[in-house]
Amino acid sequence: MQELASTYRPWDDRRRRARSLAERHSHATEVLRLYLALLDVQEVIYDAALARPPAPERLPSFAIEEALPGVIEVTVAAGPEKLATAAVARFHSADLDDLVGRWLRLEEQPLVDRYLARAATSPVFEALGASFAAAACSGRAPGTACPHCGGPPQLSWSALSGEPLVTGPRYLLCARCHGGWGHTRMTCAGCGETRGSQLPVYGENDRFPQVAVEGCKTCNTYLLHVDLRRDAAAVPLVDELAMTPLDLYARDRGLAKLVPNLVGL
């Protein structure tokens, strides 16, 4: 019998946060417009996976048949023209199984392939839980990897502690299955560096008080960190998408994100 994920449905919270951020940050309007359209399709994919759970080895076929057509449709309707054109061309090419399979194996992919694979498979993982993700995925990220599927961390975030002067625990969120796990503070998620002098933190408190860049001078990588103590309404997965100025700031300092997000930033 398939182990299903928790009964919490994330879609309404993500929609509310995306709309709120789009109203506040004009630079994120285009990205969040596409993301809001994707959320509607991803909720349908999520429900389809719950209703007709595929076997782990059938995930590529399920994604192609049940998920990709809707992802392509909203990408054409709401996405940037370049991405929309590339997505349609890719959907009409051969080797769609490989498009999904390479993401499950964490192999190198063109931007459009990874976007399509992520958009199509993440709601299935969220619906069917950690054991399904572990069985469906074979590739394991270097450095810190998700204990559920082996994927790389997309971001880090701090939970509310319940006490004003107590810092909440730090978590990482998987780019592939969206699972979360605890991780030691002031430790690079890429190489394990712990020396404070090598771990700069950059932020822009006036515009983005809840998000900071967690950098590492040892491996020259970074993650965005979302602090719920600074904004309890934040939804880490959504906030990360809207922080292009912080991404550009980190890149200007020679840092590369551990893994680009859904839209390639």
Regions picked out by a protein language model, each given a short descriptive name:
Residues L246-L262:
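C-terminal membrane-proximal segments flanking the terminal transmembrane helix
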Residues H225, N261-L265:
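Juxtamembrane/interfacial segments around transmembrane helices
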Residues G129-Y249:
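Cys/His-clustered metal-coordination modules, chiefly Zn-binding fingers
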Residues M1-A136:
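N-terminal alpha-helical interaction blocks
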